[in-house]
């Protein structure tokens, strides 16, 4: 099948690799323009661009598609069967959605209609969902409102972080799009249910600051959901302290008060229950397992976090 592929981060790169391996003709790859990154803020290509160039594929990086007649004509000239879209980062107007013979298919990281929007992976963990997955969707101009072509459930583990769930879903999405394209002629699209719609709004750095007055389970989920970005944090002696891994335990203590700090973790009071933080990062330092963190920094019982 002759494809245009549009995507930017590693989530999309996994799908591109799988489509190439499956033998599809990738006539064009669209991805976001190179962005400054790293300490030197040098321009860095997206993961999708790196994969595309490694396989000798044509890459284009328009700043926008809406109203961009030159880019739209370029897409028409390809005469693609399908455009596959995965975390591209640009809005596709109707005149672009109509260009491929069979439209545009999106790889969305949730079981729609739950978690439409920008941050479905993190929002699923924050909400305490047991399951999420991949939806392959026929795109329309709405926010993840198109007809569903296939759904692929993925379990959320008790200790899941956004990083680990991302990798599971990227692998699932890559397999799902190949499978769906392979039986596209036999699929009857299904409307999304009207019940159960939720929206996964974009994450903000402000919401990643830990509120120790919340129940321990909610705090622990937030710490895992914000790993790797934007990174949950609290205050320790006026300095930011990042928290990367945590679980909830029974018990009680003042919210934000350290109960104990040893090789098994830093145990902190919450609004209901205790939070055991097992991976931490002091300002200017590296991520450390609790064992190594407490070996270099004293956290006596009663130390207050968040102040």
Curated annotation (Swiss-Prot):
Q: What is its EC number?
A: 2.1.2.9
Query: Which reactions fall under this protein's catalytic activity?
Result: L-methionyl-tRNA(fMet) + (6R)-10-formyltetrahydrofolate = N-formyl-L-methionyl-tRNA(fMet) + (6S)-5,6,7,8-tetrahydrofolate + H(+)
Q: Which residues form a coiled coil?
A: none
Quote the record's binding site residues for (6S)-5,6,7,8-tetrahydrofolate. Answer: 110-113
The GO terms describing molecular function are: methionyl-tRNA formyltransferase activity
Which top EC class applies here? Answer: transferase
One annotated Gene Ontology cellular component of this protein: cytosol
- Keywords of the record: Protein biosynthesis, Transferase
* Pfam entry (one): Formyl_trans_C
The family database entries (CDD domains) matched by this protein are listed as: FMT_core_Met-tRNA-FMT_N, Met_tRNA_FMT_C
Purpose of the protein: Attaches a formyl group to the free amino group of methionyl-tRNA(fMet). The formyl group appears to play a dual role in the initiator identity of N-formylmethionyl-tRNA by promoting its recognition by IF2 and preventing the misappropriation of this tRNA by the elongation apparatus.
Name the family the entry cites.
Belongs to the Fmt family.
UniProt xrefs under PANTHER family: METHIONYL-TRNA FORMYLTRANSFERASE (PTHR11138), METHIONYL-TRNA FORMYLTRANSFERASE, MITOCHONDRIAL (PTHR11138:SF5)
Q: What is this protein called?
A: Methionyl-tRNA formyltransferase
**Top-down, what is the taxonomic lineage of the species of origin?**
Bacteria, Pseudomonadati, Pseudomonadota, Betaproteobacteria, Neisseriales
